[in-house]
Amino acid sequence: MSTQGPKQALFAQFAAIAKTLGHGHRLELLEQLAQGERTVEVLAERTRLSVANASQHLQHLRRAGLLKSRRQGKFVFYTLADDGILDVLTALRRIAERNVAEVERVVRSYFNKLDDLEPVTRKQLLKLIREGA
């Protein structure tokens, strides 16, 4: 029999979710799923994880109630359990950007590199693709 009160039980559940979120690969998988439903194979490819590794991380996220899954033939599709998960990811990013100097430096460096890119029209892009550039 547990001697934990309701408040402690509630915070223990919050901590379990936070622990599940405490892995970079899982956050990256959630970021991919924020863009829409994906299969394990697509998620593995986009995050450069093995299918087995991606599957294990996705199972952790699903057990924590952060994802829903459905099977279609031999494929398993994953999606975020609700929009609140996207809110959590956004809040984590904002907190990190405001309070962690290294995150701020990386973000600044990334966006400064975008300024070096040269815009192209659709027509120019198609020409570059045809030429293999």
Residue ranges and their predicted role:
Residues 1-12, 87-131:
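Amphipathic alpha-helical dimerization/coiled-coil segments
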Residues 9-53, 76-84:
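N-terminal helix-turn-helix DNA-binding core of bacterial DNA-binding proteins
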